[in-house]
């Protein structure tokens, strides 16, 4: 589904993107890197790579300015940190033959790069993602493996902003934008399911909005096969964000599309109300609440009074504590969301 550029500008997505872009380091001079040095961003002094540990911060000997030391892995220069992702650290990277080709490379923290559990987590995430990531609203897995002594996974670099940053921004998003993003997430979820997997980690931090205003889902660390989800074979590992995790995961019950629909419902609630359904204090007792089957507070009482009643009804059904009372398939939910999307100005 195409996104209208004008409405994108009206929503301030482009402004948020420009603010973020101003903070990003310029593209590297590949000739310098291939010759074994970088240029201090403050004084222009040469800093030789061989004199510094890779992926570390080095102080310039002339001006004491802090500079990041890149690392070459296969065909990519890891050039600047992007942050943490699951079990690894993620770096903005550039193809060594062409700095216009970008990627996000995930590697293990320096002190744990030989940890077998972390290695399997890093490679396992990329292996799973490679089976379903070829979709316009999913971050593509380019390649993964072992290069010299480094395990790595190369992903599509998303030039955008995380959804949690958008939710926290001063501008409230209109229903039509929220519904569009929900439909794009559903499209990605359907593709993942059709490929034999469940995503299982839907939260604002794992949804990027690219510079064109469209969804890109990231981080496949909790994805498991549909078969494993239905069998409950992963029940001993209660992983995920408590604010968005379906209650059936907490009690070790089977998961399916209705579980992802619950997580999307909690995400929709967060986007509409600009607060999570459960407070931080609630989270401390959330497991106990689900186990003893305490009744969930009425979502209608927690959403803004001027919220579209049909959207309230849809969200309430999505986050029903009882899986059988929710929408059972992405297609069923998608039909209702799309109907509201067409009606919404």
Set out the residue ranges of the language-model regions.
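Conserved short submotifs of the Hanks-type protein kinase catalytic core
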Residues: 148-162, 166
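AlphaC helix of the eukaryotic protein kinase fold
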Residues: 112-131
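Conserved catalytic-loop aspartate of Hanks-type protein kinases
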Residues: 260
């Amino acid at each position: 589904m195409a996104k209208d550029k004008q409405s994108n500008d009206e929503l301030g997505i482009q402004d948020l993107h420009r603010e973020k872009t101003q903070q990003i380091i310029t593209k590297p001079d590949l000739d310098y890197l291939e010759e074994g040095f970088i240029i201090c961003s403050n004084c222009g002094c040469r800093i030789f790579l061989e004199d510094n540990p890779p992926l570390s911060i080095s102080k310039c000997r002339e001006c004491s300015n802090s500079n990041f030391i890149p690392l070459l892995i296969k065909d990519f220069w890891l050039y600047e940190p992007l942050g943490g992702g699951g079990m690894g650290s993620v770096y903005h990277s550039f193809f060594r033959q062409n700095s216009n080709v970008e990627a996000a490379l995930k590697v293990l923290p320096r002190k744990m790069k030989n940890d077998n559990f972390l290695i399997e987590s890093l490679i396992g995430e990329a292996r799973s993602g490679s089976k379903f990531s070829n979709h316009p609203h999913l971050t593509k897995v380019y390649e993964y493996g072992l290069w010299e002594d480094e395990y790595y996974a190369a992903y599509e670099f998303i030039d955008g902003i995380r959804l949690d940053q958008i939710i926290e921004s001063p501008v409230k998003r209109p229903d039509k934008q929220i519904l569009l993003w929900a439909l794009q997430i559903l499209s990605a979820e359907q593709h993942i399911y059709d490929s034999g997997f469940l995503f299982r980690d839907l939260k604002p931090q794992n949804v990027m909005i690219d510079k064109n205003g469209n969804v890109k889902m990231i981080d496949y660390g909790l994805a498991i096969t549909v078969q494993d989800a239905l069998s409950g074979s992963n029940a001993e590992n209660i992983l995920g964000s408590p604010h968005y995790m379906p209650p059936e995961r907490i009690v070790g019950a089977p998961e399916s599309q209705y579980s992802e629909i619950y997580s999307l419902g909690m995400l929709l609630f967060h986007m509409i109300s600009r607060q999570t359904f459960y407070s931080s204090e609630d989270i401390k007792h959330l497991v106990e609440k689900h186990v003893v089957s305490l009744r969930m507070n009425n979502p209608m009482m927690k959403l803004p009074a001027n919220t579209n009643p049909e959207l309230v009804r849809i969200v309430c059904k999505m986050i029903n504590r009882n899986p059988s009372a929710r929408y059972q398939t992405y297609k069923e939910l998608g039909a209702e969301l799309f109907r509201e999307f067409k009606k919404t100005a």
